[in-house]
Amino acid sequence: YSISDDIDTHGFTNTYQISSEFGDFTAHSNEMLYKLIQEIMAINELEKFKATPRFAEAVKASALSPFEIMESLIIDPADTVSGLPEDIEKINLDMLEMTSREKNVHDKKHKHDLAKFAAHKRQLAYDLNVDVYSTNKVLQQYLNSVGWATYSSDQAVPVSLEPLDSINFTKDSHRLHNLLRDKTPEQLHKINAKYLTEMGIDKTVIEAFFANPWLTPRYETMVVGELYSQGLKGGLNEYIGLVNTSSSEQDAFFYQNITKLISHYLNNTNESQVSIEIINNFAVLKVRKHYVIPILIDNGYWSEQSAKTINNFERTSRGDGGDVIQILVWISGEV
Protein backbone atom coordinates (compact mmCIF):
# COMPACT_ATOMS: atom_id res chain seq x y z
CA TYR A 1 0.00 0.00 0.00
CA SER A 2 1.02 3.64 -0.28
CA ILE A 3 -0.21 6.74 1.51
CA SER A 4 -0.64 9.94 -0.47
CA ASP A 5 1.54 12.87 0.59
CA ASP A 6 -1.49 15.10 0.09
CA ILE A 7 -2.98 14.93 3.60
CA ASP A 8 -6.03 17.00 4.45
CA THR A 9 -5.67 18.33 7.99
CA HIS A 10 -8.42 19.80 10.14
CA GLY A 11 -6.79 20.93 13.35
CA PHE A 12 -5.05 17.81 14.67
CA THR A 13 -7.18 15.40 12.62
CA ASN A 14 -5.54 14.10 9.46
CA THR A 15 -7.41 12.52 6.56
CA TYR A 16 -5.34 10.02 4.60
CA GLN A 17 -5.79 8.58 1.10
CA ILE A 18 -4.41 5.04 0.83
CA SER A 19 -3.85 3.17 -2.43
CA SER A 20 -3.34 -0.58 -2.61
CA GLU A 21 -3.69 -3.43 -5.07
CA PHE A 22 -6.94 -4.23 -3.26
CA GLY A 23 -8.48 -0.81 -3.82
CA ASP A 24 -8.34 2.80 -2.63
CA PHE A 25 -9.33 3.73 0.91
CA THR A 26 -9.78 6.83 3.08
CA ALA A 27 -8.93 7.06 6.77
CA HIS A 28 -9.95 9.90 9.08
CA SER A 29 -7.50 10.21 12.02
CA ASN A 30 -4.27 8.39 12.77
CA GLU A 31 -5.99 5.62 14.72
CA MET A 32 -8.35 4.92 11.82
CA LEU A 33 -5.28 4.80 9.55
CA TYR A 34 -3.73 2.09 11.74
CA LYS A 35 -6.99 0.15 11.60
CA LEU A 36 -7.13 0.38 7.81
CA ILE A 37 -3.48 -0.60 7.34
CA GLN A 38 -4.10 -3.61 9.57
CA GLU A 39 -7.01 -4.60 7.32
CA ILE A 40 -4.94 -4.19 4.14
CA MET A 41 -2.18 -6.34 5.63
CA ALA A 42 -4.78 -8.96 6.59
CA ILE A 43 -6.20 -8.96 3.06
CA ASN A 44 -2.68 -9.44 1.72
CA GLU A 45 -2.11 -12.43 4.01
CA LEU A 46 -5.38 -13.98 2.87
CA GLU A 47 -4.54 -13.30 -0.78
CA LYS A 48 -1.22 -15.11 -0.36
CA PHE A 49 -3.01 -18.06 1.22
CA LYS A 50 -5.48 -18.20 -1.68
CA ALA A 51 -2.53 -18.79 -4.02
CA THR A 52 -1.48 -21.96 -2.19
CA PRO A 53 -2.36 -25.59 -3.01
CA ARG A 54 -4.01 -25.84 0.41
CA PHE A 55 -6.62 -23.28 -0.58
CA ALA A 56 -7.25 -25.03 -3.90
CA GLU A 57 -7.86 -28.26 -2.00
CA ALA A 58 -10.16 -26.44 0.39
CA VAL A 59 -12.21 -25.05 -2.49
CA LYS A 60 -12.66 -28.55 -3.93
CA ALA A 61 -13.77 -29.89 -0.57
CA SER A 62 -16.20 -27.01 -0.04
CA ALA A 63 -17.95 -27.91 -3.30
CA LEU A 64 -19.65 -30.68 -1.33
CA SER A 65 -21.56 -28.04 0.64
CA PRO A 66 -25.35 -28.18 0.16
CA PHE A 67 -25.61 -24.38 0.17
CA GLU A 68 -25.46 -22.52 -3.12
CA ILE A 69 -25.02 -19.28 -1.22
CA MET A 70 -21.84 -20.68 0.30
CA GLU A 71 -20.37 -21.50 -3.10
CA SER A 72 -20.87 -17.85 -4.04
CA LEU A 73 -18.81 -16.84 -1.02
CA ILE A 74 -15.80 -18.33 -2.79
CA ILE A 75 -16.61 -17.68 -6.45
CA ASP A 76 -18.02 -14.16 -6.19
CA PRO A 77 -18.23 -12.92 -2.60
CA ALA A 78 -18.89 -9.35 -3.73
CA ASP A 79 -22.25 -10.32 -5.22
CA THR A 80 -23.15 -12.10 -2.01
CA VAL A 81 -22.36 -8.95 -0.06
CA SER A 82 -24.36 -6.59 -2.24
CA GLY A 83 -27.36 -8.91 -2.24
CA LEU A 84 -27.79 -8.90 1.50
CA PRO A 85 -30.87 -7.34 3.09
CA GLU A 86 -30.00 -3.88 4.37
CA ASP A 87 -30.76 -4.64 8.02
CA ILE A 88 -28.33 -7.57 7.89
CA GLU A 89 -25.55 -5.82 6.02
CA LYS A 90 -25.41 -3.07 8.61
CA ILE A 91 -24.12 -5.49 11.23
CA ASN A 92 -21.27 -6.26 8.92
CA LEU A 93 -21.73 -9.74 7.59
CA ASP A 94 -21.63 -12.02 10.56
CA MET A 95 -22.44 -15.22 8.71
CA LEU A 96 -24.84 -16.63 11.26
CA GLU A 97 -26.95 -13.51 10.97
CA MET A 98 -26.55 -13.34 7.21
CA THR A 99 -27.78 -16.79 6.37
CA SER A 100 -30.22 -17.65 9.14
CA ARG A 101 -32.72 -15.25 7.56
CA GLU A 102 -32.56 -16.85 4.13
CA LYS A 103 -36.01 -18.33 3.47
CA ASN A 104 -34.75 -21.70 2.26
CA VAL A 105 -32.54 -22.48 5.25
CA HIS A 106 -34.52 -24.41 7.84
CA ASP A 107 -32.64 -27.60 8.47
CA LYS A 108 -31.20 -27.68 11.99
CA LYS A 109 -27.96 -29.32 10.93
CA HIS A 110 -27.43 -26.70 8.27
CA LYS A 111 -27.97 -23.97 10.85
CA HIS A 112 -25.49 -25.72 13.11
CA ASP A 113 -22.95 -25.72 10.26
CA LEU A 114 -23.53 -22.01 9.67
CA ALA A 115 -23.08 -21.26 13.35
CA LYS A 116 -19.80 -23.17 13.33
CA PHE A 117 -18.70 -21.25 10.25
CA ALA A 118 -19.51 -17.94 11.96
CA ALA A 119 -17.25 -18.98 14.84
CA HIS A 120 -14.54 -19.98 12.35
CA LYS A 121 -14.76 -16.57 10.68
CA ARG A 122 -14.52 -14.77 14.02
CA GLN A 123 -11.42 -16.82 14.89
CA LEU A 124 -9.86 -15.92 11.54
CA ALA A 125 -10.47 -12.21 12.13
CA TYR A 126 -9.11 -12.56 15.68
CA ASP A 127 -5.88 -14.18 14.42
CA LEU A 128 -5.42 -11.34 11.94
CA ASN A 129 -6.28 -8.69 14.57
CA VAL A 130 -9.06 -7.19 12.46
CA ASP A 131 -12.68 -6.40 13.24
CA VAL A 132 -14.99 -9.17 12.03
CA TYR A 133 -17.76 -6.53 11.87
CA SER A 134 -15.66 -4.12 9.77
CA THR A 135 -17.42 -2.10 7.06
CA ASN A 136 -14.45 -2.76 4.76
CA LYS A 137 -16.19 -4.83 2.07
CA VAL A 138 -12.92 -6.03 0.54
CA LEU A 139 -11.87 -7.45 3.89
CA GLN A 140 -15.28 -9.06 4.32
CA GLN A 141 -15.01 -10.71 0.90
CA TYR A 142 -11.67 -12.28 1.80
CA LEU A 143 -12.82 -13.37 5.25
CA ASN A 144 -15.88 -14.96 3.67
CA SER A 145 -14.15 -16.79 0.83
CA VAL A 146 -11.15 -18.05 2.79
CA GLY A 147 -13.24 -18.66 5.89
CA TRP A 148 -15.85 -20.82 4.18
CA ALA A 149 -13.39 -22.81 2.06
CA THR A 150 -11.21 -23.70 5.04
CA TYR A 151 -14.11 -24.29 7.42
CA SER A 152 -15.95 -26.66 5.11
CA SER A 153 -12.73 -28.60 4.43
CA ASP A 154 -11.81 -28.61 8.13
CA GLN A 155 -8.55 -26.74 7.60
CA ALA A 156 -6.82 -24.22 9.80
CA VAL A 157 -5.65 -21.01 8.14
CA PRO A 158 -1.93 -20.47 8.83
CA VAL A 159 -2.13 -16.67 9.03
CA SER A 160 -1.71 -14.23 11.90
CA LEU A 161 -0.77 -10.59 12.42
CA GLU A 162 0.27 -8.47 15.38
CA PRO A 163 -1.97 -5.45 16.05
CA LEU A 164 -0.90 -2.01 14.86
CA ASP A 165 -3.43 0.12 16.72
CA SER A 166 -2.15 1.83 19.85
CA ILE A 167 -5.37 2.09 21.87
CA ASN A 168 -5.40 -1.35 23.44
CA PHE A 169 -4.03 -0.28 26.78
CA THR A 170 -6.81 -1.12 29.23
CA LYS A 171 -6.87 -4.18 31.43
CA ASP A 172 -10.18 -5.22 29.86
CA SER A 173 -9.05 -4.99 26.22
CA HIS A 174 -7.81 -8.58 25.95
CA ARG A 175 -10.90 -9.97 27.69
CA LEU A 176 -13.24 -8.03 25.41
CA HIS A 177 -11.40 -9.12 22.27
CA ASN A 178 -11.79 -12.73 23.40
CA LEU A 179 -15.48 -12.11 24.01
CA LEU A 180 -15.90 -10.80 20.46
CA ARG A 181 -14.21 -13.93 19.16
CA ASP A 182 -16.19 -16.40 21.25
CA LYS A 183 -19.73 -14.97 21.23
CA THR A 184 -22.33 -14.54 18.50
CA PRO A 185 -24.01 -11.16 17.94
CA GLU A 186 -27.11 -12.45 19.75
CA GLN A 187 -25.04 -13.51 22.76
CA LEU A 188 -23.19 -10.18 22.81
CA HIS A 189 -26.52 -8.36 22.66
CA LYS A 190 -27.79 -10.23 25.73
CA ILE A 191 -24.57 -9.61 27.67
CA ASN A 192 -24.48 -5.91 26.80
CA ALA A 193 -28.19 -5.44 27.57
CA LYS A 194 -27.68 -7.07 30.97
CA TYR A 195 -24.71 -4.85 31.79
CA LEU A 196 -26.48 -1.68 30.66
CA THR A 197 -29.49 -2.53 32.82
CA GLU A 198 -27.27 -3.21 35.82
CA MET A 199 -25.56 0.16 35.26
CA GLY A 200 -28.96 1.84 35.55
CA ILE A 201 -29.32 2.93 31.94
CA ASP A 202 -32.87 3.90 30.98
CA LYS A 203 -34.77 1.46 28.79
CA THR A 204 -35.28 4.03 26.02
CA VAL A 205 -31.54 4.81 25.98
CA ILE A 206 -30.72 1.09 25.77
CA GLU A 207 -33.16 0.66 22.88
CA ALA A 208 -31.59 3.60 21.02
CA PHE A 209 -28.13 2.17 21.69
CA PHE A 210 -28.95 -1.14 20.02
CA ALA A 211 -30.95 0.53 17.24
CA ASN A 212 -28.05 2.71 16.06
CA PRO A 213 -26.77 1.13 12.81
CA TRP A 214 -23.24 2.49 13.32
CA LEU A 215 -22.81 0.81 16.69
CA THR A 216 -21.83 -2.67 15.55
CA PRO A 217 -21.56 -5.54 18.05
CA ARG A 218 -17.88 -4.67 18.40
CA TYR A 219 -18.41 -1.00 19.29
CA GLU A 220 -21.30 -1.89 21.60
CA THR A 221 -19.22 -4.49 23.41
CA MET A 222 -16.12 -2.32 23.77
CA VAL A 223 -18.07 0.67 25.14
CA VAL A 224 -20.23 -1.34 27.55
CA GLY A 225 -17.43 -3.66 28.63
CA GLU A 226 -15.00 -0.85 29.45
CA LEU A 227 -17.60 1.05 31.50
CA TYR A 228 -19.18 -1.87 33.32
CA SER A 229 -16.26 -2.73 35.60
CA GLN A 230 -15.36 0.84 36.56
CA GLY A 231 -17.95 1.59 39.24
CA LEU A 232 -18.76 5.10 38.07
CA LYS A 233 -21.14 6.90 40.42
CA GLY A 234 -23.21 8.88 37.95
CA GLY A 235 -23.64 10.18 34.43
CA LEU A 236 -23.61 6.82 32.67
CA ASN A 237 -27.11 7.30 31.26
CA GLU A 238 -26.09 10.63 29.75
CA TYR A 239 -22.83 9.19 28.42
CA ILE A 240 -24.54 6.29 26.63
CA GLY A 241 -26.98 8.88 25.26
CA LEU A 242 -23.98 10.76 23.86
CA VAL A 243 -22.61 7.56 22.27
CA ASN A 244 -26.06 7.09 20.71
CA THR A 245 -25.54 10.26 18.67
CA SER A 246 -22.99 8.42 16.50
CA SER A 247 -23.89 9.08 12.86
CA SER A 248 -20.90 7.45 11.15
CA GLU A 249 -18.34 4.72 11.68
CA GLN A 250 -15.86 7.45 12.58
CA ASP A 251 -18.14 8.57 15.43
CA ALA A 252 -18.52 5.02 16.73
CA PHE A 253 -14.75 4.47 16.51
CA PHE A 254 -14.19 7.77 18.36
CA TYR A 255 -16.52 6.90 21.25
CA GLN A 256 -15.01 3.42 21.52
CA ASN A 257 -11.56 4.97 21.98
CA ILE A 258 -12.73 7.77 24.28
CA THR A 259 -14.33 5.10 26.48
CA LYS A 260 -11.03 3.20 26.52
CA LEU A 261 -9.24 6.39 27.54
CA ILE A 262 -11.73 6.98 30.36
CA SER A 263 -11.24 3.39 31.50
CA HIS A 264 -7.46 3.79 31.33
CA TYR A 265 -7.63 6.87 33.57
CA LEU A 266 -9.84 5.09 36.09
CA ASN A 267 -7.50 2.09 36.14
CA ASN A 268 -4.66 4.44 37.09
CA THR A 269 -6.34 6.37 39.89
CA ASN A 270 -7.36 5.39 43.39
CA GLU A 271 -10.40 7.67 43.36
CA SER A 272 -13.67 5.94 44.23
CA GLN A 273 -16.12 8.82 43.74
CA VAL A 274 -15.97 9.46 40.00
CA SER A 275 -18.87 10.48 37.78
CA ILE A 276 -19.28 11.53 34.15
CA GLU A 277 -20.70 14.90 33.16
CA ILE A 278 -21.62 15.87 29.60
CA ILE A 279 -20.70 19.50 28.95
CA ASN A 280 -21.25 20.88 25.44
CA ASN A 281 -21.06 17.32 24.07
CA PHE A 282 -17.77 16.70 25.89
CA ALA A 283 -17.54 13.77 28.29
CA VAL A 284 -15.82 15.08 31.42
CA LEU A 285 -14.93 13.12 34.54
CA LYS A 286 -15.77 14.75 37.88
CA VAL A 287 -13.37 13.56 40.57
CA ARG A 288 -14.20 15.29 43.86
CA LYS A 289 -13.07 18.88 43.19
CA HIS A 290 -11.26 18.04 39.97
CA TYR A 291 -12.38 17.78 36.38
CA VAL A 292 -10.58 15.40 34.04
CA ILE A 293 -11.08 15.98 30.31
CA PRO A 294 -10.20 12.93 28.14
CA ILE A 295 -9.00 13.95 24.67
CA LEU A 296 -7.93 11.93 21.64
CA ILE A 297 -5.51 14.54 20.39
CA ASP A 298 -5.39 13.32 16.79
CA ASN A 299 -9.16 13.07 16.57
CA GLY A 300 -10.20 16.65 17.19
CA TYR A 301 -9.70 20.19 16.03
CA TRP A 302 -9.15 23.54 17.67
CA SER A 303 -11.13 26.58 16.69
CA GLU A 304 -12.20 29.90 18.15
CA GLN A 305 -15.45 28.27 19.25
CA SER A 306 -13.53 25.43 20.90
CA ALA A 307 -11.43 27.94 22.81
CA LYS A 308 -14.53 29.83 23.98
CA THR A 309 -16.15 26.58 25.13
CA ILE A 310 -13.12 25.57 27.21
CA ASN A 311 -12.67 29.08 28.63
CA ASN A 312 -16.34 29.29 29.62
CA PHE A 313 -16.14 25.83 31.17
CA GLU A 314 -13.09 26.81 33.22
CA ARG A 315 -14.63 30.13 34.28
CA THR A 316 -17.95 28.68 35.43
CA SER A 317 -16.45 25.66 37.17
CA ARG A 318 -13.84 27.67 39.06
CA GLY A 319 -15.60 31.01 39.43
CA ASP A 320 -18.27 32.20 41.82
CA GLY A 321 -20.25 29.22 42.98
CA GLY A 322 -17.91 26.74 41.31
CA ASP A 323 -16.25 24.10 43.46
CA VAL A 324 -13.54 22.91 41.08
CA ILE A 325 -9.94 23.58 42.11
CA GLN A 326 -8.15 21.82 39.26
CA ILE A 327 -8.78 20.82 35.64
CA LEU A 328 -6.68 18.01 34.17
CA VAL A 329 -6.42 16.96 30.53
CA TRP A 330 -5.83 13.25 29.86
CA ILE A 331 -4.48 12.82 26.33
CA SER A 332 -3.95 9.93 23.94
CA GLY A 333 -2.82 9.94 20.33
CA GLU A 334 -0.09 11.60 18.31
CA VAL A 335 0.38 14.70 16.16
Regions found by a protein language model. Name each.
Residues L296-V335:
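Catalytic cores of nucleic-acid endonucleases
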